[in-house]
Amino acid sequence: QTCALPIWRYKNREKWEGAITCNLAVWRDDLYKINGFNQQYHGWGYEDSDLVIRLINSGKHRKEGRYAVGVIHLWHKENDRNLSDININLLKNSIQNKTTITNTGIKNYGTD
C-alpha cells in the first residue's frame, strides 16, 4: 500500500517564500540554465530564496516535500549576519527585475 501525498503539496507552486535549500532537489539542467547559486551573497541569508525565485522566473514550479522526505542536516557554525542588508537588496533586485540568470554562478567555475 502506498501513502498518498496531500494535495497541498502542489499549492503555491510559484511562491518562493518558505522554500529553503536544506532539502531542495532540482534537475541539473534547470540549475545550469539559471547558473546556479548567485555568488554575490555572502554570510547569512537569502541565497536560497534567490535561487528559488530565479527557478520560478524561468518557468519551473515548486512541489512541497514536507512530511514526505527525510532531512539530514550537518552541523555547522551559523554564518555571520552582518551582510544581511546587502543580501536582502540583492534579493529585492531579483524579484523586481524578474531575474532568471545570475552572472556569478556555476559557469564561473569552468563547468559547461
Predicted regions and their residues:
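A short, conserved alpha-helix in the catalytic core of glycosyltransferases
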Residues: 18-35, 42-61, 66-67
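Active-site donor/metal-binding and catalytic loop motifs
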Residues: 65-82
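Intrinsically disordered, low-complexity terminal/linker regions enriched in Pro/Ser/Gly
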Residues: 110-112
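Short, small-residue-biased leader/transition segments that mark boundaries at the very start
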Residues: 2-5
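Short acidic/polar alpha-helix capping motifs at helix-coil junctions
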Residues: 15-19, 81
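Catalytic core of nucleotide-sugar-dependent glycosyltransferases
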Residues: 82-106
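Short, P/G- and charge-enriched loop/turn segments at secondary-structure junctions
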Residues: 9-15
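A generic structural signal for short coil/turn motifs at secondary-structure boundaries
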Residues: 40-42, 81
